[in-house]
Curated annotation (Swiss-Prot):
Cofactor(s) annotated in UniProt: Mg(2+)
NCBIfam families from the UniProt entry: hpr-ser (TIGR00679)
Residues at the catalytic site: 141, 162, 180, 248
Gene: hprK
Catalysed reaction equations from the record: [HPr protein]-L-serine + ATP = [HPr protein]-O-phospho-L-serine + ADP + H(+); [HPr protein]-O-phospho-L-serine + phosphate + H(+) = [HPr protein]-L-serine + diphosphate
Protein name (Swiss-Prot/TrEMBL): HPr kinase/phosphorylase
Extra information: Both phosphorylation and phosphorolysis are carried out by the same active site and suggest a common mechanism for both reactions.
Length: 320
């Protein structure tokens, strides 16, 4: 199961959440990970003795409760608090850290952080961060682009011209997200987010030209850090026989499953004389229309059926 260290959580959110170390630095490598029977949202929560969270947050009410504990009971309560599945304690709202809590965290290698932010906001930010960081992931071969604000993944066998097509689309004002190895993360039940690894970011490999830095060539707006995947365009090599057998009036909606998320897909035959950049733009525009409830093929078939019925009625009403 995916997991991260407390150290990484601290480094990624130190300034945003105003985090500071209070104790337990030796536990910086403690892991925070998704459990099979619990969602990511259950990783963070206010102080809970019954179902301890991996990240226990101490807010105003929790701090007041701990302060009311008698010194003889405190050790017992702390023993219940620091369950083996617990990885981190954060004292929020700028509250002072009690000496007993600090000592316990230090002795048991439990990272103890403080924050000046209110606990509800702190937990909301951490939940969103963990949901993205610990999301199930997969890597797909292809080029991921932002075309008309739609995340489009172009796939196909090597040598079909995916990179050249991407370069053409970028020159027409669209943006590159990732080339070759597209990292996909399931950040929601039906949502996939595509990103690029830091090593490959900004680069596009085009045969004959080598590695191109798209940001330097086309400017800042030619690059996007991430995008929700909404459409897959699969390029297939086609000959005359394939084009003859192609169903021109298909009304079936094709989908491809990635990480158990169904994504709309379109197959584009690659043949001599076809302007693939224009076809991709048309496919994206058509997808946007379908999101609005407009289906050109279905509309044409309905119009065709209506015309046939009118012709049939006119034929029946025609005098012999």
């Amino acid at each position: 199961m995916p997991s991260i260290s407390v150290r990484r959580l601290f480094d990624d959110n130190q300034y945003k959440l105003q985090l500071a170390w209070a104790a337990g630095n030796s536990g910086a490598d403690n892991r925070i990970g998704v459990e099979a029977d619990k969602p990511v949202l259950a990783l963070v929560g206010h102080l809970n003795f019954i179902h301890p969270n991996q990240i226990q947050v101490v807010g105003l009410a929790e701090s007041e409760y701990l302060n009311r504990l008698e010194s003889g009971e405190t050790g017992y309560q702390f023993g219940n608090l620091f369950d083996i599945s617990m990885s981190l304690v954060i004292v929020a709202n700028g509250l002072p850290v009690s000496p007993g809590l600090r000592d316990y965290c230090h002795k048991n290698d439990i990272p103890l952080l403080t924050s000046k932010l209110e606990s509800p906001y702190l937990m909301d930010v951490l939940r969103i961060y963990l949901q993205r960081t610990l999301a199930a992931s997969s890597v797909k071969h292809g080029v991921f682009l932002d075309v008309f604000e739609i995340g489009v993944l172009i796939t196909g066998h090597s040598g079909l011209g995916k990179s050249e097509l991407a370069l053409e689309l970028i020159s027409r004002g669209h943006s590159l997200i990732a080339d070759d190895a597209v990292e996909l993360f399931r950040i929601g039940p039906e949502t996939l987010e595509g990103r690029c690894s830091p090593m490959l970011r900004d680069f596009l490999e085009v045969r004959g030209l080598g590695i191109l830095n798209i940001r330097h060539i086309f400017g800042e707006t030619s690059i996007r850090p991430k995008k929700i995947l909404q459409l897959i365009i699969n390029l297939v090599e086609a000959d005359d026989e394939y084009m003859k057998q192609l169903d021109r009036l298909s009304i079936r909606t094709e989908t491809e499953s990635i990480l158990n998320v169904n994504v709309r897909s379109v197959t584009l035959p690659v043949a001599v004389g076809r302007n693939l950049a224009v076809l991709v733009e048309a496919a994206v525009r058509n997808y946007i229309l379908q999101l609005r409830g407009k289906d050109s093929t279905r509309e044409f078939l309905e119009r065709h059926q209506t015309q046939l019925k009118e012709n049939e009625q006119n034929h029946e009403n025609r005098p012999d």
